[in-house]
Swiss-Prot record:
Positions contributing to ATP binding: 30-33, 51, 87-91, 415, 480-482, 496
Reaction catalysis annotation: ATP + H2O + a folded polypeptide = ADP + phosphate + an unfolded polypeptide
Official protein name in the record: Chaperonin GroEL 2
Name of the encoding gene: groEL2
Superkingdom, natural source: Bacteria
Amino acid sequence: MAAKEVKFASDARDRMLRGVDTLANAVKVTLGPKGRNVVIEKSFGAPRITKDGVTVAKEIELADKFENMGAQMLREVASKQNDKAGDGTTTATVLAQAIVREGSKAVAAGMNPMDVKRGIDLAVKAVVKDLETHAKKVSANSEIAQVATISANGDEEVGRILAEAMDKVGNEGVITVEEAKSLATELETVEGMQFDRGYLSPYFITNAEKLKVELDDPYILIHEKKLSNLQAMLPLLEAVVQSGKPLLIIAEDVEGEALATLVVNRLRGGLKVAAVKAPGFGDRRKAMLEDIAILTGGNVVSEDLGIKLENVTVNMLGRAKKVVIDKDNTTIVDGVGARTDIDARIAQIRQQIDTTTSDYDREKLQERLAKLAGGVAVIRVGGATEVEVKERKDRVDDALHATRAAVEEGILPGGGIALLRALKALDGLKAANDDQQSGIDIVRRALRAPARQIADNAGEDGAWIVGKLLESSDYNWGFNAATGEYEDLVKAGVIDPAKVVRTALQDAASVAALLITTEALVAELPKEEKAAPMPAMDF
């Protein structure tokens, strides 16, 4: 086991504080509409330019192991904030730095770290309650666009496209962000349930111009196994022909004689039919087939469920208003499944999302949820250069998360004003002792930090502006750093999602309290690299 170096008490906290300051000072310059850029060197290719706090935080690694511990714990604040709310990472970092700095001073002055922590927790609880009281629910499309614009660092085009995407696919829909091959940023939406399987034979095509299969009001057979001959389902096919409606077959595969028979029937015009492979693999395939069955009001033909193909009747088939199939995708529009069954399935998937520990599984479950509940939208981000596209894609991702957060918990005035106004919530707080009171005062001072930093980044005197803002009792009145005006920030469209502000404070206080109550640091001593022996010489 390698030898360790141990630091104690104030020496340990000072080392960590230096690391915290290094990371926070690099991150906080990006805060606000006039935040500065940070340029990050890459081991290959062009350097990366970003205004995204968490991207900067993830790139910082310090040479001193003890300083690096402080920096990494602060990085944890940005990462947690990014995972929970998707935005507000810089605000969380600024708050954490302010709490750690003030807390370290208090502990160095001889106060009990645990009581200081209790005071911080007490103050945070009071501020969170105040934020929840003042949060205003978001419903209008224009408000959603405003939130998205702010999170995208003032990019109005991104705000408009995101609001349009949310409007089309709903709050539960999946919105993915990709890099475009062109200059323009575009939105593409898919209504209904889409899965990535195309037609099994081009002979099924009904629209020769678009090379698509379009089936109106079709029956849908959902089969778990392969279909290699159609003998077992002849009675079913005859019943479908008599009904005069088209048929879509979804199966693990349709091969050989079965596929040939379907193609011949399709070409002769006796049966309007198309076949596609089932989406997914293994257990996920079973779950997705069940989703399709619930959406279309049909049954999955599966031996596990005791349903054999020869016993299937027309009543057991799914139905939909329309099905569109191209060479890569199948889209089912307006399935006739019962709303109560679909809602129950959605609730079940939500439960699985909450309990799963795998990020991959969570992503796949969210895709299934979106296909059942809303739809899918793809935002293709364009730009003149690769560096610009990457930077813009970062901002669109931020804006997407912030917009979802705003719809979830409502909005507050932006620019750090909501935290400034929450100072009043701390006035009536009763502490059990002086050390706890010190913890409350630490949060009181930290709440001013984001507004001050936004003003500083805009080239103004942050401390003076914060003092002026505290003179007003109007909750929404604040400093608009983008225009340099004092105004009603909600009317001006300077708004923050309540969830972003709340989680920023909670995450910052949580990690800062851990740093304040740290009494020892342990790190490996650097290994001495011995010089390589000289090679043997030939004389």
